[in-house]
């Protein structure tokens, strides 16, 4: 079995990422629960370099292509090879749960993946060869686990600082010629590192879909763009703050679900939880685990985090990565700081520093909410006081000057009635 040691630049110097190639078939004798996170399949560009390029993409921007759906279907077949005998031939709603970010491309990727993992064996009513499988999602603004742009002012400030960091300046110097080249070709006088993803994204999408590049583009230039993109992408989760606020929420959810399974509160049947998400989701999760891989996650690749139960009830955590599209190669990481074998308890102890106690508060969101809440309460209090004052004044106006009527009433009788009429 091949053991590899890769030296990569991480958050604080050199990080040794240790991994080994492993067989595709899982060890189902001890396997108890699996979390998988995959990136959606091939898609159209999220943004365009040139407005006229929209005609190249009839599906629209940021949408799953037919090729992407096929990639996910094949990934589902690959997962079936690894877990099929353990999961069974038919989808079991008590054993399997699929969650997606709220994008067409990830929702459709999940459906295509499940079609590959659980192909229909028998026709349903009406003779349809179809096995419908539910895919769950939540709205983007509330999805702090899978939505890469969930509002978090603290993380945004931290990321802005990264663009000015020594590491970022080193990238600018290393790729000065490429940045100058694209600044000229795209008419961008102040070419920023953060714009490189859009350049890579468009060129890569065109390459994947056999669309002709502009005349000034060629394979050797693209190779440098690819290198530039991968180095810039490593800035995204370069600090503990970014890992805690961008990757920690998902890792914490995964850890607590493992703990619930181990304690029995998740139920005996629960086996498999899948997240249909993005390259940034996988990258954030890996970085939070302490793994700084030098190539950004590709289309229809997946991370597998397994929990194994030993005879003595000890739970072990193993992390696998299928990091190539449509290639069977699977690697297993050694988790930095968590001795091999890595127990669930040790993993939690090592990584709890990345579990936000109050994500909204740490992001600086609760201050705004509390301010709005106080304003609303203040308005209600002022309105109530004003209303009571007006009622009191009105009541006083109705206290009538007293005078005698037909000699039968004395000076204390009200003009329009007594207090019972109020």
Swiss-Prot record:
Keyword Nucleus: no
Cystine bridges: 152-363, 205-302, 338-342
Catalytic reactions on record: a phosphate monoester + H2O = an alcohol + phosphate
Signal peptide annotation: 1-13
One example GO MF annotation: phosphatase activity
Superkingdom, taxonomy of origin: Eukaryota
Enzyme class name: hydrolase
Entry's EC annotation: 3.1.3.2
Sugar-modified residues: 104, 210, 218, 312, 323
UniProt cross-references to InterPro entries, sorted A to Z: Acid_Pase_AS, His_Pase_clade-2, His_PPase_superfam, Histidine_acid_phosphatase
Assigned keywords, A-Z: Disulfide bond, Glycoprotein, Hydrolase, Signal
Active site: 40, 279
Segments crossing the lipid bilayer: none
Assigned protein family: Belongs to the histidine acid phosphatase family.
Protein name per UniProt: Putative acid phosphatase 5
Organism: Caenorhabditis elegans
